[in-house]
């Protein structure tokens, strides 16, 4: 069972939630000690594994019929096997967020509450955002909320609104990009998403456009951030130019996102060390 939970948690994507915590901590901290403060350690630990078990566990429970025809589940990802023990562990991982949030500054609570609601209702009824075009993309701003919570948890203040907006737009683009390989299985199952509504080519153009907008918003925070985010629309251009299948390119993005996140984090750490 534990091996199955490990696979269910998508270890390849762990840093999609835990990585933003590092970014948020690096910009929220003002001293080296704050980088290793209790809020920083607790949030990173939660979003590294329990949050991933909850997010993807909920997804797999309510997508089990769709996943029967999803080719991604034949290799690096697993199909939901059911079982009471697995369901209980997934639920506990979600409820545990309340214990994580309790000792944190109140400024962090709205971001954690929003993350829980979006992580749940993205896949679960009654809202099931993932089956409504535009809302499926918009709700995936949940991936930037760990960064906002970490910033607030360490600093006791809210993060810059433009930084949250830029990150939200980036997450929207990532969601639709990752949904392009699922277009045919989703259509076969009668699921409507931004990607199925647009089709592969227009969905790819949508990703490029929203990533350009993300870069523009980040540039208002710091021009260097905007330049860094231009990597994403440039990659889309390369994918189209070289006619690389999105289903293949999809598996590059954990490395791409880790690299971009590392640069963001190093910038924050530079500010902590050098003022």
UniProtKB/Swiss-Prot annotation:
GO molecular function: transferase activity, transferring alkyl or aryl (other than methyl) groups
Protein location: Cell membrane
Description of how activity is regulated: Inhibited by bacterioopsin.
Membrane-spanning segments: 13-33, 38-58, 84-104, 107-127, 134-154, 160-180, 203-223, 225-245, 253-273
Topology class, membrane: Multi-pass membrane protein
Disruption phenotype: Loss of bacterioruberins production.
UniProt cross-references to InterPro entries, sorted A to Z: Prenyltransferase_related (IPR050475), UbiA_prenyltransferase (IPR000537), UbiA_sf (IPR044878)
BP terms from Gene Ontology: carotenoid biosynthetic process
Family note: Belongs to the UbiA prenyltransferase family.
Protein name: Lycopene elongase/hydratase
Organism per entry: Halobacterium salinarum (strain ATCC 700922 / JCM 11081 / NRC-1)
